[in-house]
Amino acid sequence: MGSFSIWHWLIVLLIVVMVFGTKKLKNIGSDLGGAVKGFKDGMKDGSTPEGTPASTTAATPPAGQVTNQQAHAADPGTIDVEAKHKG
């Protein structure tokens, strides 16, 4: 009673095809496949090959964001909490 038979799943599939159509389902499938591929590529090892330079986006802060060096230059009496961890 808790599990569905093959006939239940076929009826659900038939209703989904009738509602969305085969073209829309194909587009959804290709979009989902592209998203999964992008996710897998993103989850691969973050190291870059030796011949490829590292990305410079991490070195440049976004406009309007204050870096640690700028913050310490503005107020030398502040303490960097991240630097005071027990090692």
UniProtKB/Swiss-Prot annotation:
The keyword Transferase does not apply. Keywords: Cell inner membrane, Cell membrane, Membrane, Protein transport, Translocation, Transmembrane, Transmembrane helix, Transport. Residues 46-64 have a biased composition (Low complexity). One of its GO terms (biological process) is protein transport by the Tat complex. The keyword GTP-binding does not apply. It is a single-pass membrane protein. Residues 40-87 are annotated as: Disordered. Coiled coil: none annotated. It comes from the Bacteria. One of its GO terms (cellular component) is TAT protein transport complex. It is found in: Cell inner membrane. Disulfide bonds: none annotated. GO terms for molecular function: protein transmembrane transporter activity. The Tat system comprises two distinct complexes: a TatABC complex, containing multiple copies of TatA, TatB and TatC subunits, and a separate TatA complex, containing only TatA subunits. Substrates initially bind to the TatABC complex, which probably triggers association of the separate TatA complex to form the active translocon. PANTHER family: SEC-INDEPENDENT PROTEIN TRANSLOCASE PROTEIN TATA. Part of the twin-arginine translocation (Tat) system that transports large folded proteins containing a characteristic twin-arginine motif in their signal peptide across membranes. TatA could form the protein-conducting channel of the Tat system. This is Sec-independent protein translocase protein TatA. It comes from Paracidovorax citrulli (strain AAC00-1). The gene is tatA.
